């Protein structure tokens, strides 16, 4: 049986200081590496509730490979981090000065994890958020148009930080990657009013934008630039050009056309896709 990467770093003979804290249906682990850069990541639905023992927080290996310090937030299910114990614990970390210790703090996640990154970013004033296909809330009195995640909707949305748009004034910069063809994702981004919002339209990538970028071997480069605060929209769109050769892109666009009564355009689009891929492989 293997052990998680974070444990190898902070077990008694490990190279770094750190901790692991279990909090009911959540857990937090911390690895202290680079004194200048802390990255805080949040589970998404793919990882949340995983029962295997060798479980790492989202992007653990990527962050370790870059030598950055890491605070990883685990979820035991589709909780959307609506848990008073977790909220209090992260607030206490702020009060103890953990986030203030670092010159640069970035928070990152995808879907549910992106909500977490946006919801808690204000605990580290001046921080950067890297959010892939985020929700801003699942409170149905605020966002009745997003009913995709019924287990998330059942969480306690009366808890603090349940509408991220109310807590962004101290955040430094927000990179938001989303597919504008996914109506709910687009509407969540439209709710974010921030002077340093960098909207990154990932047309055809669908809700699982981070997964598709990983298949394109672009996710690490995009995340690295965003965490450092150097990523530009033009660079993102340049790196996203190869999406037109990814099968998920083709299927997402075909679904989009069909849903809008334009299925007559699907055969032509599919032929163009196949010709483009054949030309690349020739």
Predicted region positions:
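Glycine-rich nucleophile elbow surrounding the catalytic serine of serine-hydrolase chemistry
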Residues: 109-119
